[in-house]
Amino acid sequence: MKPDCSPRRDSCCSLAVESGCPQAGLVSRPHRHPAGVKRLLIWLLGCLLLPLLIVLATLERAPLVSRSESISPASIAEAKCLLANNDPRRLQRGDQRTASIPAPLIDEAINHLVSRSLHGRGTFALAEETAEIRISVPVPGLAGYRYWNLRAQLQEAEGEPRIVAASLANLPVPSRLAEFCLNSAIGLAGFSDEWRAARQLIRKLAFEPARGVVEVSYVWEPGVLAHARARAFPPEDIASMAAAQKALAAQLDHYSARARVPLGQVLSGLLAAAASGEATLRQRRAALLVLASYLAEKNLAVLIPEARLWPRPRRLKLILLGRYDSAQHFAVSAALAAWAGEPAANAIGLYKEVEDSRGGSGFSFADLAADRAGTRFGELVAEGSSRLD
């Protein structure tokens, strides 16, 4: 008589196994599966929670970097001198140059970029053969621990600088992981091509703390300038600027050659021509840039080669409160604030007034007031304020 192999009776389990019954496995497997599934779920939950716990553990109550977002007029002067000595328009492919970049200029540039992109603060400081970057980024919506504080130490080297030490709060970060995260962040921001091209230019980096500069030896490649121009002025912005210049030329054609035209009339006409919807901000920023270049008597073709084919507005005197120079200050500061932010606009405006005071034309509170008013107007444009409608 064959043994009963039915899985319905627990009393037959041992007999089924001993007799080699093919259904024996069906009896014991249900008792093993729940434990395996439980271990798998715990493992998956741990994998999901571990990064979150690490992130929460690195939040701190106080920022490592606490400073304002402002840019000093001295940094504007240093940047102007640096560009004059390394003007890319005068460089040929393969030219070898060494640029001495002041450490304070790098410091304020890093702080400005972190402020604009992450709403945080940053610093840069030199030491012997190394430099340190510190960044504090606020984390909204968390009570108590509210900042990510990052330190990264760079070492001078042939080619691009290398991260030799890094930490997030008190948690050490391996240098390779820090470099990977840096490259990934740059890629996510959409600057992979520009970053790769810039890295290919650099031949040597040297820190000179005694002189307070970073020596950057590079070999020029014109493609970098083309990448930078394309990044700064995408096709949509160029199309908006072309439309704004056409509208400006059409407006000014209605005035006589010696007319003194209130800036408000021209500006309101340009802004009114901006379309409603998502394109409004782009078109208004384009209008400010076109108007600023017109009043500064600069040719946009220097930045945008396509502008050579655009209509040329006739030269007239646009005035603000009866003054041509006030109209210039207002329009230029408004464009700077809309494109680069309020700190840069304020710094450039103050720098120009300081230079005027040294050059003989004198420091003008009226011009400075026009600068600040233009900066505020540019901020309203950048914010898409309904007050402009």
Where are these regions (language model features)?
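Second-shell loop/turn segments in exported
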Residues: 95-96, 167, 317-323, 335, ...
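Cysteine-centered motifs
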Residues: 5, 12-13, 21
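Intrinsic-disorder-associated, low-complexity terminal segments enriched in Asp/Asn/His/Tyr and depleted
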Residues: 4, 10, 31-33
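Small-polar-interrupted transmembrane alpha-helices in polytopic inner-membrane proteins
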Residues: 341-357
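Alpha-helical transmembrane segments that form the membrane-embedded catalytic/substrate-binding core
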Residues: 329-333, 356-389
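Extracellular/lumenal and peripheral-membrane lipid-interaction modules
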Residues: 38-258, 372
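Glycine-rich short-loop/terminal segments
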Residues: 237-328, 334
